[in-house]
Amino acid sequence: MSLLSIPILASIAILIAAIYKFIVYPTLISPLSKIPNAHWSTPISPIWILWTRYQCQENRKLHAAHLKHGPVVRLAPNELSVNDIGGLRTVYAGGFEKGQWYSIFDNYGVPCMFSTWHSRTHSARKRMISNIYSKSIIHSSPALAEQARVILYERLLPIVTSTADSARSSDGVDVHDLWNATTMDFITAYLFGLKNGSNFLQNESYRRHWFQLYHSRKTYTFFPQELPRSSQFFKRLGINLTPTWVDDANQELEAWTKDRCDHTSGFINGGFAAKDSDPANEPVVFTTLLSGIEKEQKKGSESVLNDTTLRFPELSIASEMIDHLAAGHETSGITMTYLSWQVSQDLALQDDLRAELLTLSPNMLLSASSKQSIPSSKDLDNLPLLHAVLMETLRLRAAIPGGQPRMTPYPSCTLGKFTEIPGGVRVGAQAHSVHRNAQVYPDPEKWDHKRWLDTENGYSEEQRRERDRHFWAFSSGGRMCIGSNFAMHELKLIVAAVYSNFRTYIVKDEGIEQTDGYTCGPASNKLFLRFERIIDHSS
């Protein structure tokens, strides 16, 4: 045998090994090979799903794949998607951890509760603040009640009234901008207190600047989120796959939030909070998180948060605050946009909704004769039409319709009929598909609020149970949206305040179609409605 044949044989052996590892094994032998492929290339390459995400077509293409192949689909050599209740229960209530994908939600270089990878760390963070986002606290909080009263009666409704009375009312107002301003003022008031929160409703020029910074970064998350190692590699070579102005925008948003935190900290530590008799100025979330961290610090090195939250307490608080205000304003703003768009197409529905809202005591009719009050949360929750309109909007136009990835546990797990799925496989579900199960939601692309009106839809108990089980706008399990009760409460208050006093008409809805991705609003980021004041002469 010649010496030349040795490297040749070695090359052949390497080639055979490579073919086995990257083609034969993933395609024919791996436990994942038994799972249907979303695309012919998925067993050997992630290019299809990466390109799909880059083109912002993930939600629709994954939904089509599930319709064709069933509840478990393979998206890449090491990635799966699930779309049934059993899969949701396994993944989101079965100890599947988060992974690298969520690190993009870190702020100031430190994780927030949402971006933490491991459940133990997440649970420790969640215990600090979960009580103040509970339904009982949300419904009974004097601070939130007064914050809502000021935001609705002293900020939002005067703006809506002025646009309705304006000679240019026929031009309409961009309610997507208006609703986002409203929800931002709501969440920052609960975080920092009304005094130290935002006033985006009355500061139009700055809110437009802030929102422009916030939304301009969205199209540049693909590389750091889906290809973080490649992004870092090219960055070391001096090639930045993300424009530098995106970093500048992030820094400005972080600086703005840190300024809110510093003012709130001074308000508390300077003794001003204790002397302030206005409940609206109570920084509910900030104070609770600060107290939780101080309590956790007593555990010292034994705390699971010792290397993160306790090491950088101020930045950890700021990271949590920016996560809450970002998610808290945008998702609810999107929901209000689509809700108002839907009901603006049906004046009879608006009249029925208003009639129901006027049964509240106190109701939310504008009146110059007395100080306006906020109706009780319990009474709001007992309004079936209001609840139905909101639930159907959250179903069809979930603000976060995209995938919620997790990592399979080691050594292996089972998903549906597929066994021995190895650890470290990315797997997720998306509300876009869960909410479009035609067996649960007939004609799923149709907005039909009567799905949620049990006195009218004729559903059996089993149908109602399945309908509720498949509602996934806030995810599920121990890491579901912590702010779901807050969101439902503020949205019902905003709808009640507006539709007790006004009718809305569509002026311009070009670009109202929902984008594709993780958090998704209108493609145009706009919706123009005209408001018409309803004068109640009996009040």
Model-identified regions with their sequence ranges:
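C-terminal helix/juxtamembrane-tail motif
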Residues: S2-L4, C520-S539
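N-terminal membrane-proximal hinge/A-helix region immediately C-terminal to the signal-anchor transmembrane segment
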Residues: L3-A124, R149-V150, E154, T182, ...
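Cytochrome P450 C-terminal beta-domain/meander region
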Residues: L67, V72, I374-E392, G403-Q430
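Cytochrome P450 heme-thiolate monooxygenase catalytic core
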Residues: G99-D106, S140-M336
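Cytochrome P450 heme-binding "Cys pocket" and the immediately downstream C-terminal segment
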Residues: N196-G197, L347-Q350, S460, E466-R467, ...
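Cytochrome P450 I-helix active-site segment
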Residues: Y206-L213, S344-I400, P422-G423, D448, ...
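Short, small-residue alpha-helix embedded
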Residues: T331-S344, I494
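Conserved cytochrome P450 K-helix/beta-meander segment immediately N-terminal to the heme-binding cysteine loop
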Residues: A429-E461
